[in-house]
C-alpha cells in the first residue's frame, strides 16, 4: 500500500536525523528495499535495528497483526565510494525495471529518481545535489547526464566484483580494509557474521594446495575473494 511506503520514508527520515545518515539512493519495493547509506559515525547496525523495528511496529499496528515483516537480517556491503557510488545509484533506481514491474524508473514513484530529475525539494537526508554535481555543476546538464547514465545501465551487473560477500571495490580497497579488520570495530562489525570471512589465500596458494586445476579454481571462487575473470587471468 502507498501508505506503507510513506510510513517507511517517515521512519527513515527520523533514523537519518538521529544517526547522522546520508542516503545517496533508495528504492522501496513491494517486499524489500535498497538503501545506499553513508554512515559518518559507523552506526549502521544501530540505525538498521531502529529502522526495521519502528517500521515493523507501525505496520503491525496499522494492519492489526504481529510478527516480522522482513525475513532474516539485512545484507550490507562496504563500498568503494570513488569507484562504485554512481554504479550503485544507477543499480538501485533500476530495480523496478529489472523486476519488470515498470518499463522506466520514472514510472516507479518510490525511489529517489524523481528527486534526481524533477523539481521536487529533496529531504535533508538525501544527497541529491552531491550526486548530480558529479555529472555537471550546471543542474540542467547534470540531470540530463544522470538520466542518460541510468538508462545506459539497464543490463549491467556490478555484483561480479563483490569480494568476500562484503567488499565492493578494487584490490587496493579490499586489502586496505582487510588489513584493518582488528581496528575496525566500528566498520566491519557492522556486517552480519555470515558475511564476514577470514582473508582468502592468494591464487598461487590455492594452486599449490590443490590436487588439481579444477579444485584450485573451485576453492578460489568459493572463497568469494576472486571473480572468474581474476582466476582465468592468473
Label every PLM stretch briefly.
Residues 1-25, 29-30, 38-234:
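Short Pro-Cys-Gly-centered "Cys-loop" motif that presents a nucleophilic cysteine in a tight turn
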Residues 35:
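Conserved N-terminal diphosphate/IPP-binding helix and adjacent helical/loop segment
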Amino acid at each position: 500500500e502507498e501508505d506503507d511506503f510513506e510510513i517507511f520514508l517517515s521512519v527513515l527520515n527520523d533514523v537519518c536525523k538521529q544517526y547522522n545518515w546520508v542516503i545517496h539512493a533508495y528504492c522501496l519495493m513491494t517486499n524489500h528495499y535498497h538503501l545506499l547509506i553513508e554512515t559518518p559515525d559507523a552506526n549502521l547496525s544501530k540505525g538498521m535495528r531502529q529502522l526495521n523495528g519502528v517500521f515493523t511496529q507501525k505496520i503491525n499496528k496499522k494492519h492489526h497483526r504481529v510478527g516480522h515483516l522482513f525475513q532474516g537480517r539485512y545484507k550490507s556491503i562496504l563500498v568503494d565510494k570513488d569507484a562504485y557510488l554512481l554504479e550503485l545509484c544507477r543499480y538501485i533506481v533500476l530495480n523496478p525495471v529489472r523486476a519488470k514491474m515498470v518499463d522506466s524508473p520514472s514510472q516507479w514513484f518510490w525511489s529517489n529518481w524523481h528527486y534526481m530529475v524533477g523539481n521536487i525539494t529533496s529531504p535533508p537526508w538525501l544527497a541529491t545535489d552531491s550526486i548530480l554535481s558529479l555529472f555537471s555543476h550546471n543542474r540542467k546538464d547534470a540531470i540530463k547526464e544522470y538520466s542518460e547514465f541510468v538508462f545506459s545501465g539497464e543490463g549491467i551487473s556490478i555484483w561480479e566484483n563483490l569480494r568476500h560477500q562484503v567488499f565492493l571495490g578494487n584490490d587496493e580497497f579490499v586489502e586496505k580494509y582487510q588489513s584493518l579488520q582488528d581496528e575496525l570495530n566500528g566498520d566491519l562489525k557492522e556486517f552480519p557474521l555470515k558475511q564476514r570471512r577470514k582473508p582468502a589465500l592468494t591464487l598461487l596458494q590455492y594452486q599449490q594446495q590443490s590436487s588439481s586445476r579444477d579444485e584450485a579454481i573451485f576453492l578460489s571462487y568459493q572463497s568469494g575473494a576472486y571473480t572468474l575473470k581474476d582466476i582465468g587471468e592468473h
